[in-house]
Amino acid sequence: TFLNGLGLKRIVPVEEVDDQSGRPLGKPLWAGVIDTVGGNILYTAIKTTRYGGSITCCGNAASNSLPATVLPFILRGVTLCGIDSVECPMDHRLRVWNKIAGEWKLDNVEALAEECSLEELNQKIDMILQGKVQGRVVVNLAR
């Protein structure tokens, strides 16, 4: 599958990352988490992160609220770090982009995105809505 081709070893069902128990701590599972969803899924990540682990948050697709307690931060020393893509200084962006293009570059990065022209965009949007596109679509205005 597409995800296996990217090196994925296991797909975690949403039920495992959306704890509705109300408990302030869960079984420590993760050393680190990159969250793009927010809400209770982010809280589940926080309360199931191992001692000294870190969570980054860069989105709020599910919710921008965080129904959390401070216990994971105090008892496990968990760190929550917000990723700001708006105010990030250009010199910092360039350093990170250079690393992504160099030493951090994925072997199969071409599989993550495809290009389309502006004229092809409506067709691509329809395909995305039908679930027929995997990865990202980049509009190349020069094409």
Regions found by a protein language model. Name each.
Residues 1-40:
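Adenosine-nucleotide cofactor-binding segment
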Residues 40-106:
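Glycine-rich phosphate-binding loop and adjacent beta-alpha segment
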Residues 3, 33, 45, 80, ...:
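Terminal peptide-recognition signature
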Residues 94-143:
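C-terminal hydrophobic helical "lid"/dimerization subdomain
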Residues 20-22, 40-44, 120-124:
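Short acidic active-site motifs
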Residues 15-16, 37, 61, 91, ...:
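Short beta->alpha linker loops
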